[in-house]
Amino acid sequence: NLIISETLKQYVYSFKNKKILSTKQNFGNISLISQMFQRCYLKESNTGAFFVNLINNKQGDYSRYIFFYINYLIENKKIEEAKKIAGQLEYINSTLLLSQSRSWIENGKFKEFNKIFSCNNHNDIVSEFLFLVSNLYSSQNDFENSNFYFNLSNYLNPNFTFNLSLIAENFYMNKEYIKVKEVL
């Protein structure tokens, strides 16, 4: 809970003061993700490097953040760079989110990215953090907390329907098949 509250304080500080809090606690990769999104929100020039460092981090699977990097590139009119990254994604070996990203790029539907997430929207950023927390709880089979944080995340950004797969998986793991069907 300390990690959650401190990270949320950092976000609020950044949103309110338009800068990153200089004295902050380090929570490892969660802090890297949070700094990346804060820099994206603040439109800092080194934001792209933060995305690349996270995506290439060997300490875990951060492929989800390829979507946010492509989104960032599109918001900043770097379409050719976004196309290059999307072109490296494989439909078969990628998540639904990344496969959809590639499809949108290939079909020139760049505005679709902004319909579900924007670095300019503080609700979207906090929603993604809460989704990360939900995912962490789910990986520990703590589905009650996972669902709680998922619902907060979904409230802040109901347009990010790709996240519904997590709640469906949580229901499935709890053998709540009727709820899985409702989500799908």
Regions found by a protein language model. Give the residues of each.
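Alpha-helical solenoid repeat scaffolds
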Residues: 1-184
